[in-house]
Amino acid sequence: SEMCIRDRDYTDKQVLVTTDLLLEGIHFDLMYVPLKHLGYKSAVVNFSDIYAMNGRPKQITVSLGISKRFCVEDLEEFYEGIKLACDIYDVDLVGGDTSASRTGLAISITCLGEGEKGKVVYRNGAKETDLICVSGDLGAAYMGLQLLEREKSIFNGEKDFTPDFSGKEYLLERQLKPEARKD
């Protein structure tokens, strides 16, 4: 979700809050998404929501539903990605929760940020005459996903198949390790 809400006002800042829920088999496929990349991406999509409101992400909480097939090393790899994202974007991981899951991995991340009063941008403030600008490129992440899905379907039919992504690294990176646009 790209939904952000405004919490309460204080001083010259507004508190911004956003939450995303990512479910295995719906939002990601662990057959081709490394856990470190998943941790990174899970955090960055939340940071992006705050940046989209002209805010700055400050803190996150991470809550996980974990099935029995995951070991401690898997979780360490996932949190390496979270930590990398937090370090790059100067965001603090301040808490979270864990629970057992019968159906795979569930990830819920809440990001708290702040924006200057009067400069926070809301979706409902858009008007017909507004200019919409895009930073980055459109469709590269989707093309990366299509490549991964194509190679997965071939692999499922031929177990000795080795995917070849040469020349497609940029598309894969847009899918597996996207960056929040803060410019």
Regions found by a protein language model. Give the residues of each.
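Helix-biased detector of long, well-ordered alpha-helical tracts
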Residues: 1-2, 6-183
